[in-house]
């Protein structure tokens, strides 16, 4: 679940009325390959991904200091054509217009049992953009970190920095911070973010929330 913006006030029950849901299933095919798919209520979007780990960081006694993986994903909005943000009755609604793709290289390092950092540069390709001046390919340099505060509690964060002059001025970079709380066989996650979407094309190129507002 991802709730709405807190600054909606009591009228929006401080974000609870604007909840967005994504139901997903991930499957580890091997110890290096993972695939997954999901469906979000935001713009009624279906998404899928594949992640392959090329290198794995090892303990003392070997020479591999980082973990290296490649993630490729795609998303498809299933909104009725009249509901599409770019809908124009004068234009044809091509199926390809609804698709977007994302590719990321993830470089991670576990410095200790408590502290992990990752850097994940990548590109998002949008088949359809709003104006002819908007690029179809959006390049970003992003990263995240995780710190264990105790045996069962960890704090983590991630930031997606889109390079300049690629998005309209009303869009923002995605910033998220949160906590992981382990309780037996479950991990509860409480995150705060300025992004509504839970798929790459959405939260990297379509974030409108502002942390300062």
Question: Which functions belong to the PLM regions below?
Answer:
Residues 1-104, 108-127, 138, 147-154, ...:
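Transmembrane beta-barrel domains of Gram-negative outer membranes and organellar outer membranes
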Residues 131-137:
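Short helix-loop boundary/capping segments
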């Amino acid at each position: 679940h991802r709730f709405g913006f807190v600054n909606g006030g009591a009228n929006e029950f401080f974000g609870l009325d604007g909840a967005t849901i994504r139901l997903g299933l991930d499957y580890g095919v091997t110890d290096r390959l993972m695939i997954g798919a999901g469906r979000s209520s935001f713009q009624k979007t279906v998404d899928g991904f594949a992640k392959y780990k090329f290198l794995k960081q090892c303990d003392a006694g070997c020479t591999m200091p980082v973990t290296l993986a490649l993630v490729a994903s795609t998303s498809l909005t299933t909104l009725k054509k009249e509901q599409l943000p770019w809908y124009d009755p004068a234009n044809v609604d091509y199926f390809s217009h609804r698709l977007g793709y994302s590719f990321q290289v993830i470089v991670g390092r576990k410095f200790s049992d408590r502290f992990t950092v990752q850097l994940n540069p990548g590109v998002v390709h949008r088949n359809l953009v709003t104006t002819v001046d908007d690029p179809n390919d959006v390049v970003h340099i992003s990263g995240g970190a995780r710190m264990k505060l105790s045996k069962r509690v960890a704090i983590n964060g991630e930031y997606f920095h889109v390079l300049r002059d690629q998005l309209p001025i009303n869009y923002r970079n995605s910033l998220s911070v949160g906590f992981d709380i382990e309780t037996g066989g479950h991990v509860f996650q409480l995150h705060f973010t300025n992004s509504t979407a839970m798929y790459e094309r959405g939260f990297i190129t379509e974030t409108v929330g502002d942390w300062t507002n």
